[in-house]
């Protein structure tokens, strides 16, 4: 976000979530609400209901009004939700696109990318890749994109192998 603010020619930042899509719902609806079911997924580092460091973005979204951020965080602690209002949600959507992918989507994405590009990705990167593809299909935006992938597919070997070779590939392991 800050690089974009300083002039890096970035059209959209894309927030990709797994089935615990609290951030997708927040960006699209303007309400951060943790009163929802929590799911354990194949992308466990994304298994969250309370996003760390979101308040840094909110600080910019709220014109650096720290008192407003403190109120929102207090509302989150006491009522498990807060709303940023239409104007701030529109600001968020002017900068960000958001989407989510469930475990099946991720497995399909791992297999697709492996088959088409001979690249083996982890489950977290599959979330990002799938959401980017969904964004491109719905928006028509074909801007060159960078996905920041920080996990090894071998750390999630069973899920990645199942995605590429099928359920029987891990039977008995």
What are the residue ranges of the model-derived segments?
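PLP-dependent amino-acid enzyme catalytic core
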Residues: 1-173
């Amino acid at each position: 976000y800050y690089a974009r603010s300083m002039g890096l020619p970035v059209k959209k930042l894309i927030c990709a979530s797994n089935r615990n899509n609290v951030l997708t719902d927040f960006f699209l609806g303007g309400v951060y609400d943790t009163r929802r079911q929590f799911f354990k997924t194949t992308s466990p580092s994304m298994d969250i209901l309370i996003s760390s460091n979101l308040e840094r973005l909110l600080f910019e979204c709220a014109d650096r009004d720290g008192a407003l951020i403190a109120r929102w965080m207090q509302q989150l602690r006491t009522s498990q939700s807060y709303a940023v209002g239409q104007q701030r949600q529109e600001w968020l959507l002017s900068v960000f696109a958001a989407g989510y992918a469930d475990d099946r989507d991720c497995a399909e994405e791992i297999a697709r990318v492996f088959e088409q590009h001979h690249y083996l990705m982890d489950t977290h990167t599959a979330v990002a890749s799938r959401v980017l593809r969904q964004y491109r299909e719905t928006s028509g935006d074909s801007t060159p994109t960078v996905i920041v992938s920080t996990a090894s597919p071998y750390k999630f070997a069973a899920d990645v192998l199942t995605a590429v070779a099928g359920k029987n590939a891990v039977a008995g392991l």
